[in-house]
């Protein structure tokens, strides 16, 4: 039986939700990773995070397109974001929304596993238990939270979708036009193909920062660097 389609009605609001954490005032970049492939299923005796390489036969058997199952893209995106100096400076907040609409809060202090196998195990735990806590205390490092994502974004924040089909901009110049003392929200796809516009109807504009298609991780790397330069984070 394939899982992952449940609602998040049992989820709590994260401790750092808008209005409840003074540190949130320091956040300057909020990233929503949309359309992430996060689907679990029982294969053999255990529940696993489905991916196109390991579970190709299972996916064919259930008439699924293996090309759609790329959770490794989310892994790459999270490593790029959370390893960035911007995150280490406390100026970044990340949310994940899966293809099935499951919304996940990511604590900036989490250390994402370096290997995909361990990352997959982490995500199975989060999807089934609705959260994962720090080993040395009750702090939630990842937590399934209630939709819509806009409930967790600062009121009045500018919301921008990233797409190769969007208006082409020089990213450093574009970031320089955003208010320096207010957070902005960038919505970036974490899927193998397609776009985020149809699911990110809460955004106000759509931009591209390369004339060439970029992987999610490459696009996010550029975004973090642009913000680091803008804010003087070395």
Task: Please place each PLM-identified region on the residue numbering.
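Intrinsically disordered, low-complexity basic segments at termini and long loops, enriched
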Residues: 1-5, 203-204
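RNA substrate-binding interface of SAM-dependent RNA methyltransferases
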Residues: 4-170, 228-233
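Preference for well-ordered, secondary-structure-rich cores of eukaryotic proteins
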Residues: 8-9, 179, 207-208
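Short coil/turn segments at secondary-structure boundaries
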Residues: 43-46, 173-175, 198-201
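Short, well-ordered alpha-helix to beta-strand connector turns
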Residues: 156-157, 182, 203-204
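Strongly charged, low-complexity linkers/loops
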Residues: 168-178, 185
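Loop/turn-to-beta-strand initiation segments
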Residues: 182-186, 190
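Structured adenosyl-cofactor binding patch, chiefly the S-adenosyl-L-methionine
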Residues: 192-234
């Amino acid at each position: 039986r394939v899982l992952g389609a449940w609602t998040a009605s049992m989820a709590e609001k994260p401790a750092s939700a808008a209005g409840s954490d003074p540190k949130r005032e320091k956040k300057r970049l909020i990233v929503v990773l949309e359309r992430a492939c996060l689907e679990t299923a029982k294969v053999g005796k255990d529940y696993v995070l489905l991916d196109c390489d390991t579970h190709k036969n299972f996916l064919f058997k259930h008439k699924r397109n293996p090309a759609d199952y790329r959770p490794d893209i989310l892994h790459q995106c999270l490593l790029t974001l959370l390893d960035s100096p911007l995150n280490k400076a406390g100026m970044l907040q990340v949310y994940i929304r899966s293809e099935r609409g499951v919304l996940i809060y990511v604590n900036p202090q989490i250390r994402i596993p370096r290997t995909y196998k361990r990352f997959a195990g982490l995500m199975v735990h989060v999807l089934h238990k609705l959260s994962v806590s720090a080993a040395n205390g009750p702090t939630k490092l990842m937590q399934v939270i209630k939709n819509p994502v806009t409930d967790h974004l600062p009121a009045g924040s500018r919301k921008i979708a990233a797409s190769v089909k969007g208006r082409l901009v020089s990213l450093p110049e574009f970031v320089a036009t955003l208010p320096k003392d207010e957070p902005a929200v960038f919505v970036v796809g974490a899927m193998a193909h397609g776009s985020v516009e149809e699911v990110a109807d809460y955004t106000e504009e759509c931009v591209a920062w390369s004339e060439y298609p970029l992987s999610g991780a490459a696009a996010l790397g550029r975004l973090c660097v642009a913000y680091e330069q803008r804010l003087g984070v070395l």
